[in-house]
A protein has these predicted regions:
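HDAC/HDAC-like amidohydrolase catalytic core signature
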Residues: 1-133
Length: 133
């Protein structure tokens, strides 16, 4: 079992990012850490790498589909992303729940677009569905 691997940034034209691209470009250069979510020069790069790890994990699972051994993935990435909204940057909280890009939403959109599969998202924290509902 491979426990860790480096990730590549998610491509800017990933299905889930198409609508958010202009927002990201406009938000990050001038964002100030005045909300709960702190932003630095490397925040967007880190968020894209975290989302890229999720996309790579999904591709890895599908690469093993139908083989004798099953394959699963768990992505423990920073910054978190499961609460990020596609429609904006919260002026008080910043990236909404300390999240910039919704890794789960990006991964689900990738699974549908690249592998033609339906996706179920099970969000079991206290803010269930926040960012993917």
């Amino acid at each position: 079992m491979q426990k860790s691997r480096p990730s590549s940034p998610v491509r800017p034209l990933s299905p889930f990012l198409v609508g958010a691209g202009a927002l990201l470009d406009a938000t990050f250069p001038g964002a100030k850490p005045d909300g709960m979510t702190h932003v630095s020069a490397g925040s967007l790069r880190a968020a894209r790498r975290a989302a890229g790890a999720v996309v790579a994990a999904i591709d890895g699972v599908f690469a093993h589909a139908g083989k004798e051994t099953s394959h699963a993935a768990f992505c423990l990435v920073r910054p978190p992303g499961h609460h990020a909204m596609v429609d904006g940057w919260d002026k008080v909280a910043g990236g909404n729940g300390f999240c910039f890009l919704n890794n789960v939403g990006i991964g689900a959109a990738h699974a549908i677009a690249a592998h033609g599969k339906r996706v179920a998202i099970v969000d079991f924290d206290v803010h269930h569905g926040n960012g993917t509902e």
